Amino acid sequence: GSLTGLISMPRT
């Protein structure tokens, strides 16, 4: 849900 979150794991 965050900036880096979207890049590493967008929706896991």
Swiss-Prot record:
What Pfam families has UniProt attached to this entry?
Periviscerokin (PF08259)
Q: Which residues carry this modification: Threonine amide?
A: T12
Which superkingdom, per the lineage? Eukaryota
* Keyword entries, A-Z: Amidation, Neuropeptide, Secreted
Q: Where are the transmembrane segments?
A: none
Tissue expr: Expressed in abdominal perisympathetic organs and abdominal ganglia.
Q: Give compartment(s).
A: Secreted
Q: Which GO terms describe its biological process?
A: neuropeptide signaling pathway
Recorded GO cellular component terms are: extracellular region
Q: Main localization of the protein? A: secreted
InterPro entries named among the record's database cross-references:
Periviscerokinin
Role this protein plays: Mediates visceral muscle contractile activity (myotropic activity).
Family as reported in the entry's similarity comment: Belongs to the periviscerokinin family.
User: What's the protein name?
Assistant: Periviscerokinin-2
